[in-house]
Regions:
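A "functional boundary" signal
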Residues: 25-242
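Bacterial N-terminal signal peptides
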Residues: 11-22
Length: 242
């Protein structure tokens, strides 16, 4: 009875802290054009592509964006053009070849990103499009296989983008499998990675709350409270502009 009462109290406090966080810790976004110094013509055309991301016609539009970016010597926008094709097949209507198309363009952006030293696009499409697609489709063993490959690769190369993405993916997979002991491992890894490399702490409160929730699921109320106490240290931390 006491354990149930404690768990209930912690759950109430989790909700309280979610409400306390301004905007639920959404990062303060800056203009992408200003941040990355994107050519105005490219940026305007990219916005048209984004608006049409679910339309079949966007594939040809993104091919055009890629060629425009190539003419400008903008490798980043070339990567964006390819990566956006994974957005199309991820967000667009379901059809028979959807998964194969998503795999194809995930591999395409991975190849381009590796050749041009842009690991953020390499890992983003892999984790947040292909693996997340598998997770949402309940193909959890496939998702776990890909995420484990990503963990091995990113850790061996010491690529922070990859480690962040794969730890987040593995956390979601184990939560979906209701394997909360394993989920706590990756919730903690995300926190440790942020602190070790002094990464942006704007949503570190969220990470501690998620860790606390995982501990609740394993009936470890003391650890849940400890994580919740740690979360309070980062309430109000805003997104830094780099």
């Amino acid at each position: 009875m006491e354990a149930c009462r404690t768990t209930g109290l912690v759950s109430i406090f989790l909700l309280f802290f979610w409400l306390l966080i301004p905007g639920h810790i959404h990062g303060q976004q800056t203009s992408e054009q200003e941040k990355y110094h994107v050519d105005s013509t490219l940026f305007v055309y990219y916005q048209h592509c984004k608006a049409a991301i679910k339309s079949p016609s966007v594939i040809l539009m993104l091919d055009t964006l890629f060629l425009m970016a190539k003419d400008k010597g903008d490798l980043r926008m070339q990567a964006v053009a390819i990566s956006s094709k994974t957005d199309h097949f991820y967000f667009g209507p379901s059809f028979e070849g959807q998964e194969d198309s998503l795999i194809l363009y995930t591999n395409t952006i991975k190849d381009f990103a590796r050749k041009t030293n842009q690991p953020q696009y390499y890992y983003f499409a892999w984790a947040n499009r292909l693996i997340t697609y598998y997770t949402k489709q309940k193909k959890l063993n496939l998702a776990l296989y890909e995420a484990n490959k990503m963990q091995q690769e990113s850790e061996s190369r010491e690529e922070i983008d990859g480690m962040q993405n794969c730890y987040q993916a593995l956390l979601r997979i184990y939560q979906s499998k209701e394997l909360y002991k394993q989920a706590t491992v990756y919730a903690q890894k995300l926190i440790d990675l942020t602190l070790k490399y002094n990464l942006n702490k704007y949503n570190l409160t969220n990470k501690y709350i998620e860790l606390s929730n995982c501990y609740l699921r394993t009936n470890e109320s003391t650890k849940a409270w400890e994580a919740l106490e740690e979360s309070k240290l980062y309430i109000g931390v805003t997104c830094k502009v780099t």
